[in-house]
Amino acid sequence: MKPTMLLMITVFLIFPAISQAESPFSSLQSAKEKTTVLQDLRKICTPQASLSDEAWEKLMLSDENNKQHIREAIVAMERNNQSNYWEALGKVECPDM
């Protein structure tokens, strides 16, 4: 009885770790989500000067509060929760340009 129970506990502890291991495409998915968030932020915070995507990203992520709100938006996107996504983006402060 004990070996069977021990095996069951081991399986239940190991299986979630295996299923949540990062796939080879997870970084691509993360990059896509980040790009989508930054594109939506460009619609909300229209820069007056034409900035490159990299400069725009650095500007938006230069504030710690903005970083947190962008992380919240990405989590909401992963969970397919549009209302939380737009709520998180609405909290991002547009930088002065």
UniProtKB/Swiss-Prot annotation:
Domain of life: Bacteria
InterPro entries assigned: YicS_fam
Protein name: Uncharacterized protein YicS
Lineage start: Bacteria, Pseudomonadati, Pseudomonadota, Gammaproteobacteria, Enterobacterales
